[in-house]
Swiss-Prot record:
Residue ranges of the region described as Disordered: 90-144
Comp. bias intervals (Basic residues): 98-130
Top-level division of the source organism's lineage: Viruses
The organism's taxonomic lineage, starting at the top: Viruses, Varidnaviria, Bamfordvirae, Preplasmiviricota, Maveriviricetes
Protein name: Uncharacterized protein V1
Length: 144
């Protein structure tokens, strides 16, 4: 066997050029065995890029409660931690929430409006409209 070149670099540790000893590594589909898993670079390529959140350009989205507390603490001259504990802030937030001025961001998938899926057309049976028209034709033929 010939030495395998991977990424333009010769294979290391070969003792006699064509052997299959454990020190040399052996050919496996044109790639040296043991390299199939890939390194950090290939794993980085495979990973999915973040679309949002911490560590991205857009940053993490603030919850409406956090945004309200920050605004409340600036307006009333109170620390953020005190605003979190104040019952007045909680009452004001719940009133704004009920009036619809504060919208919920994200949320769970179970709540809210769901789109209904359209039924898939069957390839075997044909369309339902065709079957209905056939039934009507049969009724007309029997009526004659």
């Amino acid at each position: 066997m010939s030495k395998v070149q991977l990424y333009g670099t010769p294979m290391r540790g070969g003792c006699c050029g064509g052997c299959e000893c454990p020190n040399c590594g052996f050919k496996l589909g044109g790639v040296v065995a043991g390299v199939l898993a890939g390194g950090k670079v290939s794993k980085r390529r495979k990973s999915v890029a973040k679309k949002g959140g911490i560590g991205t350009k857009g940053g993490a989205k603030k919850s409406p409660w956090v945004a309200f507390l920050q605004r409340y603490s600036k307006e009333h001259g109170v620390k953020y931690s005190e605003a979190m504990q104040s019952p007045k802030a909680k009452k004001e937030y719940s009133a704004l929430k009920k009036s619809g001025k504060i919208h919920k961001v994200g949320g769970s998938k179970s709540s809210g409006h769901r789109k209904t899926k359209k039924p898939k057309k069957s390839m075997k049976g044909g369309s339902k409209t065709k079957k209905l028209s056939e039934k009507q034709l049969m009724k007309e033929l029997l009526a004659m």
